[in-house]
């Protein structure tokens, strides 16, 4: 007779004994008696799927970011080039660091402007007529000095005011021109953006409209900037300032010393210095 255990093994499905040896029954294939995908394998597969999705996402988004970065870098380079060119143009038209007050005609012009201002004040307030009437009433010469002192004091005050305020005005006008230029650039940029968005509905005329408005604003800013420059040049001539050119700058014969200071060296002193260096370099005689 056959052994009942052998019959039992034939009746039992495959993997029946292994079924109870596994702690998690849900992860077992009942037909083959094999373990299903373990959590580690499942985690690895999920990580691979996530990585594939992330790579797909980065492959689609990264080129767009690169294009945006290229555009922003081009805009930055364009703005930097525009700023450098404008600064060169501005420095050529407004030589603020090369203006000298050593012109001989400066004080003559300031005196003339002070006298003109006094005459204008006198014409408006009629100081001269009242002064002549006062002289006719008071025949004493000692009483005439009061109005004269007033005129002299007013003249000195105006002369010092013209001297000090003219320097401030000449220094402030280049800054005002920079403000005018940058305000014009900002207004032009905003107007171009607004007109481009409004005229975007009519694609055929959007470029023409934006270019026309930008050109009109640029022309207005240019006229204002040029008019400001004319005022600047007129004030330089009127107040007796002098623009120092490269030819006017005299190079002094100063040489740096060992302490970093500068000292005047004539031809005689240079020759004596060379002789001293030669004497120092000569070998000393050895005593026998």
Swiss-Prot record:
One of its GO terms (cellular component) is cytoplasm. It is a multi-pass membrane protein. The chain crosses the membrane at residues 107-127, 144-164, 174-194, 198-218. InterPro entries: DUF999 (IPR009340). Its main location: cytoplasm. Signal peptide: none annotated. It comes from the Eukaryota. Belongs to the UPF0494 family. This is UPF0494 membrane protein C212.04c. It comes from Schizosaccharomyces pombe (strain 972 / ATCC 24843). The lineage of its organism: Eukaryota, Fungi, Dikarya, Ascomycota, Taphrinomycotina.
